[in-house]
Amino acid sequence: MSQLLDKETLKKMIRENVKTLYRKTLEAASAEEVYQAAVFAVRDVITDKWMKTHDEYYEKDVKVVYYLSMEFLMGRFFGNSLINLEMYDEVKEVLEELGIDYNMVEDAEPDPGLGNGGLGRLAACFLDSLSTLQLPAYGCGIRYHYGIFEQKIENGYQVEAPDNWLENGDPWGIKRNEYAVEVKFGGNVRAVPKGNGEYRFVQENYQSVIAVPYDYPVIGYGNNTVNTLRLWEARAKNKLDLKFFNEGNYQKAAEEELLASTMTDVLYPADEHIQGKELRLRQQYFFISATVQRVVERFKKHHTNFHELPDKVAFQLNDTHPTVAVAELMRVLVDENDVPWDDAWEITRKVCAYTNHTIMAEALEKWPMELFSRLLPRIYQIVEEINRRYCLELQAKYGMDHEKLRRMAIIADGQIRIPDKAIAE
């Protein structure tokens, strides 16, 4: 077994955890309760490696890959973690010596509702590989409350129910309130003169939510590296409006909390209607803005020259959903850190990389200009400027071929074409 955890110590920890968590003896505990107790025991070993890994990254100021994805189909953490820690056989023996069927304990873990199919599984495999290869990396996404759905068959027909994978708690995720950031939506943008004909752009009259990260360990196989899957959860800036509550308008009083909760409830909400489209765009910008803001703040602890950012940070955009990261990084550099546009664009192009997974038309996202500009007004301005400069490059290369320019432009026919935006960068 691990040099940090012998069999007798593990047995004692599982018994003590059952008692502390559930006020029960081990013999009276359910499989789900034993599972939770075993996770907290094993997590001691994981956390030691996890802390050492990130202390080393910080001290050496290494370059870190941030893999941005709407989904991560990780599968159950328990068994995979034990295999990568090379503790699987020993933990199984310990549970059997305690009179517990290991398979029942493993089956008690809910499958995290964080992914759907190939895109999410690819993201999970990349994270596993990066840890096993001992390459510094974060996965960054959303901590969905319900994922896609739980499938039931009734009278031969599929019935969809919420997949409440967090119902009995989450022993793997560690809430990091100290890294929470504000994400802004809507409002208007005001240009404030800075002098010399330059302006600073300020977003006003906006709605905002607080993005709170939860960190999950991604363990390398047979080594001491533990990277991080960071999933963001939305929280209302003001959970309860006491004025409305005291007036008896309880629904209005909790409106802000409901809006925030909805943002991280479900992976891929139905988008046949405008409300669904808006929710999807909110989700995408929410986790991207939170990630970019946090990464830049982390970079600034070591550095003052933003031209060094590409030497320390790489954003890998997994399909079209995270591509708003291009404009968001520009916003953070230009608006919040006074980096000149041309310098910021050079930095952004070096930091961001994009992988497209399909050429099916339905998978190549487009956003109505009205929705995009209303929900993300400053990001829309930045995309407009990127598009203007990109079209000038196209004109210089292809001349005034209006049909070619229309087909290749980022903004055309009342739509913002997301793949074109990613490729243009």
Where do the model's predicted regions map?
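A conserved ligand/cofactor-binding region detector
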Residues: 1-425
